[in-house]
């Protein structure tokens, strides 16, 4: 079972998304900020991170930078309400595999998740 970590400060979104992902066969968990993300990732590697950009403390860009610095190899999909072109380009340059704007369509998100996770299997 593939594991997904949701990193977002919106507790309601995290709870709903975790439930939706678990229902379709993923092992999903969530944390509410960048600091918690590194505590989690240090102890339990995951296949994919769904990452918000705007959070208190360490934001999504900080998380992307730190993933690279600490050489934590995991796929990242940015999932954010701040869907401007510059953020998408900057995220890609920092290693994000894809970029989805909120509000998201779960079916489209699921297609993107499957696409990103399958890249290693090609």
What are these language model-derived features?
Residues 11-29:
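Two-component/phosphorelay signaling modules centered on CheY-like receiver
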Residues 32-36, 59-62:
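Acidic catalytic/metal-coordinating carboxylates
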Residues 39, 61-73, 90:
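Short amphipathic alpha-helix used as the core "switch/output" element in two-component signaling
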Residues 44-50:
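Active-site beta3 strand of CheY-like receiver
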Residues 55:
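Receiver (REC) domain active-site loop signature in two-component systems and cognate sites
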Residues 104-114:
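C-terminal output helix
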């Amino acid at each position: 079972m593939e594991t997904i970590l949701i990193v977002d400060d919106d507790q309601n979104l995290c709870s709903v998304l975790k439930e939706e992902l678990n229902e379709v066969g993923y092992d999903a968990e969530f944390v509410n900020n960048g600091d918690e993300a590194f505590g989690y990732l240090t102890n339990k590697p995951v296949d994919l991170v769904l990452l918000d950009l705007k959070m208190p403390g360490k934001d999504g860009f900080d998380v992307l930078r730190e993933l690279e610095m600490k050489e934590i190899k995991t796929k990242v999909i940015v999932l954010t309400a701040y869907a401007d072109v510059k953020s998408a380009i900057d995220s890609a340059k920092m290693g994000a595999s894809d970029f989805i704007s909120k509000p998201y369509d779960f079916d489209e998100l699921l297609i993107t998740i499957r696409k990103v996770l399958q890249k290693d299997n090609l």
